[in-house]
């Protein structure tokens, strides 16, 4: 199979309607991948702020649960919580970190910040690169790349997003009510919908089908996915600057389509397929 064959397959976008129902520009990494990076934060990133080190030691699972909150932007509007549309905002993240008064709140805020930090690479590089390689069918390509990565790392998780949302629904709902203009009931309904949707899609095994198909069409997929995981993980130590009050210069939400295409257009085809150059310092102004 060739990349040309994959482009032809992706033209038949109607095959992927079930996937598109749960995919949007708000998502970059899937929920499984966000929990993976939050686990990496717990294990491998030395935090310089003592309060957050204490929070991680006391409530590690709340860090993982907090990493699921930003993706409520997909469902909040359907449960009377339109304020959840704006979850990928750095100033909102800073307010959460600064206002956290307990170890549990700090753990949730840390997981939330971790989500946004790694989304910089996903929105600005991972997703646009795969759209460039696999064909100009953005929503479908986005969904396939996202779910394929989730399947790539799923066996490394110690808890699924659905398990985390269900087990910590009271702490999550209270945290969301505190930081967004919504009721605790709306927050809980949004969490339940996100949890059920994630469980439904995992049960359907669509993510496995995406992974198998992508691997068949793209023989460098596993190598490239590991590159993104390694390089994104290597930049997670920069979360210490966020904890100290700094704000990255890169957006954690989807950039404009023209800008994203220009960025990946600067890379040679072999870089897109293998090791795309990524920004080293997320606090430096984005070039061009």
Give the ranges of each region predicted by the language model:
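N-terminal leader/auxiliary helical segments
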Residues: 2-111, 117-288
